[in-house]
A protein has these predicted regions:
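Extracellular polysaccharide-degrading/modifying enzymes targeting complex plant/algal/animal polysaccharides
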Residues: 2-256, 276, 283-312, 473-480, ...
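Short glycine/acidic-rich loop motifs that flank beta-strands on beta-rich extracellular proteins
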Residues: 49-51, 214-216, 238-245, 249-250, ...
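Hydrophobic, small-residue-rich alpha-helical packing segments that form membrane-like cores
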Residues: 271-273, 277-333, 338-367, 371-373
């Protein structure tokens, strides 16, 4: 028998939970709900950490948590309100409050330093600690000062350094940098003292909140499956630094479960990650940072095999849907995951303003950061104003990144130590840096690319690949570089020079022209006795065709406007599949601007006639062949073929030809096209 439970702030947890007698907390309903039940949460603020006791049994017997129709979103907060502030007589605008540690329970974020594998700033043992806690004035978070003196006279900053690229980046809100806090925890006295500079505001008259809870909606146990969370606002949970070798906390997440749907929510101001589809703790808990016995790479490799031993399999872990969420103002990620992010669908989310406070940094920071996202589809998301839009790391296999819009990021996309096959198609990449590539085996088809491309090899890390559509490990390999397909893309450089990389495909010009040339290079390396008995890993072939190079973009031969890459397809047809498709050079520029309007995001551009007239063959799985190492077809998660006849806007074609780039409807001259909108 299916039940419908109701929750209202004015309710009573001793009640029965029906419409007339609602519970007061979501947590009470989460203890009662059984498979097939629905928990309807009415508008109001809920300061609690929801730990669902049970999951559903199947896709048809879920437990659903949803906001009440026709009401404002219910809000779950990881913070508590704080009053009783006292202003310092000798330091105007600086106020202090002493909190009893009992308000935090067994987790005090102001006593817990940021720590873990791949954390670079603050550097453990070198830099002063920073902490998981935060202070909020009317919903806006402050910055932590590592000294009390820094609270007395904070200096505004108009630029911060991007840690990865070492370039200056403008601060979005300069005045906000003067709002700072410092805390000291006295375990003997059982108190936490916070000092904060409110810049003239009276904290006893305003809404001031401090971090208390690590999560908002997160089961404490694994395998709490088939839960839907819809229509909430969640904010101000701390989470924790979330590398792939630790428990990956999120403001909301399934905690190593299967079949969750997280949809139609507003998720913001997580100190670290808003949504975690990540790893549990038994397969790794920051052992590199704790012991230094082995490297982080080795512990991460071990984590894959440990996870297999505890049930990392298709149908048991992952398989989540994250869609139609607005996610912003988070310190590390909007969405993070390792292995639990396999077999998922990440669709139509608005991901923005991620990691722009730059209070900390490590090699896990991006709007979306996944490891081992096997067969995961990331589609139709709007990703902007992030230090890095998307970072796919380790085992990007069977993954598809399609119909997304990237803009106003420091970097749009990074893919690391993966061997394919993965597909990046029908996206708009409008930031100055489109792609940092530390990987191989990708196919890039029908994208509009405005930024620079920078490829790398990775000879010192051998990472896993899998049998198709499973988590079973088939082998490990290093990244030799190349073995990629670049077909039907439109390279449209903008006036802003990329801080890294080159426009077009010229950065790949050292790749061999064919599989035959690759083998000749490898044989020459084996003939050199000075290299010993180790592996030989020369650059692999690159396959390109059907691309348009506008003014400023260079083809593989590094000559601007010289774009005939077809021989790479013709000579290698037996290995690569497909047929010849000649690229096109156009010596005219194509200015591209993205504009936010009330009804969505618009792309404005002036298209040269030569570009509008081009027609390229629709790309299919048969045209893409297989990556050299993995030997898996480029195909959909269910094993069916790709037929890339649908553009960014979802417009399917009936012909076998289409325009290069992501928009088949471009016309000569001025274009003003809505490329992303909310469903409602």
């Amino acid at each position: 028998m299916k039940f419908e439970y109701h929750v209202k702030p004015t309710g009573n947890d001793a009640a029965c939970g029906d419409t007339e007698h609602p519970f007061a907390t979501i947590s009470k309903a989460a203890q009662m709900a059984s498979p097939g039940d629905t928990v309807i949460v009415h508008e109001g603020v809920y300061r609690e950490q929801v730990d669902p006791r049970r999951g559903g049994l199947s896709e048809h017997e879920r437990i659903t948590y949803c906001g009440a129709e026709g009401e404002a979103r219910p809000v779950i907060k990881g913070s508590e309100c704080v009053q009783g502030w006292t202003e310092l007589a000798d330091h105007p605008h600086v106020w202090t409050v002493v909190l009893d540690n009992t308000m935090f329970g067994d987790f005090n974020p102001f006593a817990t330093p940021i720590f873990g594998d791949w954390l670079e700033m603050p550097k453990f043992g070198e830099d002063p600690d920073k902490h998981l806690g935060d202070v909020y004035l009317n919903g806006v978070s402050f910055f932590e000062s590592t000294t009390l003196e820094g609270v007395y006279d904070p200096q505004p900053r108009d630029t911060d350094e991007d840690f990865a690229l070492k370039i200056p980046c403008p601060v979005p809100d300069v005045d906000r940098t003067r709002y700072v806090w410092h805390a000291e925890v006295d375990e003997n006295a059982g108190t936490t003292t916070i000092w904060a500079n409110f810049q003239g505001a009276d904290p006893n008259e305003e809404l001031v909140e401090v971090s208390v809870r690590r999560t908002c909606f997160f089961p404490s146990r694994n395998h709490v499956n088939y839960i839907t969370v819809r229509g909430f606002e969640m904010a101000q949970a701390t989470g924790d630094w979330a590398p792939p070798t630790s428990q990956q906390w999120g403001m909301i997440g399934p905690n190593w479960s299967y079949g969750w749907i997280i949809e139609d929510n507003v998720l913001h101001d997580a100190k670290f990650s808003a949504v975690s589809l990540g790893k549990e703790i038994s397969s790794g808990d920051n052992e590199w940072a704790k012991t230094e016995r082995k490297t982080g790479y080795q512990y991460q490799l071990e984590a894959v095999f440990k996870a297999r031993r505890i049930g990392w399999e298709k149908g048991l872990i992952g398989g989540h849907i994250v869609r139609n969420n607005d996610i912003y103002e988070c310190g590390q990620n909007a969405i993070v995951g390792h292995m639990g992010s396999a077999f998922c669908r990440i669709e139509h989310n608005h991901v923005h303003h991620i990691a722009l406070k730059r209070e900390f940094f490590g090699w896990e920071v991006a709007g979306i950061k996944f490891h081992a996202a096997l067969d995961t589809v990331i589609a139709n998301n709007n990703i902007h104003d992030c230090s890095l839009g998307m970072w796919m790391d380790w085992q990007t296999q069977g993954t598809r990144i399609t119909r997304n819009v990237f803009h106003d990021n420091v970097r749009d996309l990074m893919i690391e130590v993966s061997h394919g096959p993965y597909l990046v198609d029908n996206n708009v990449f409008a930031s100055p840096v489109m792609f940092q590539n530390w990987s191989q085996g990708g196919a890039f088809v029908n994208n509009l690319i405005c930024g620079g491309i920078e490829p790398h090899t990775v000879p010192d890390r051998s990472t896993p690949y899998h049998y198709p559509h499973t988590t079973e490990v088939a082998g490990c390999a290093v990244v030799s570089g190349g073995d990629e397909r670049w077909l039907n893309n439109m390279f449209a450089p903008q006036p802003v020079k990329p801080t890294v990389g080159e426009y077009g495909l010229s950065a790949y010009s050292d790749c061999p022209m064919s599989m035959h040339e690759y083998l000749e290079r490898q044989r020459a390396m084996w003939a050199d006795p000075s290299q010993g008995g180790g592996e030989r890993n020369p650059l692999q072939s690159l396959y390109a065709g059907g691309n348009i190079y506008l003014s400023g973009a260079q083809g593989l031969n590094k000559q601007e406007g010289a774009a005939d890459d077809s021989e790479r397809m013709q000579e290698d047809a037996s290995f690569f599949g497909g047929t010849a498709s000649t690229s096109v050079a156009c010596d005219e520029p194509m200015p591209v601007t993205l504009v936010e309007e009330p009804d969505g995001l618009y792309l404005q551009c002036i298209v040269p006639q030569a570009v509008a007239d081009t027609r390229m063959q629709v790309v299919t799985s048969d045209m893409l062949g297989v990556p050299r190492i993995v030997e898996e077809r480029y195909e959909q998660p269910d094993g069916s073929d790709y037929v890339l006849d649908t553009d960014l806007l979802g417009q399917a074609l009936t012909a076998t030809e289409r325009k290069a780039g992501a928009l088949n409807g471009l016309v000569s001259g001025e274009n003003h096209i809505r490329i992303w909108e909310w469903n409602n």
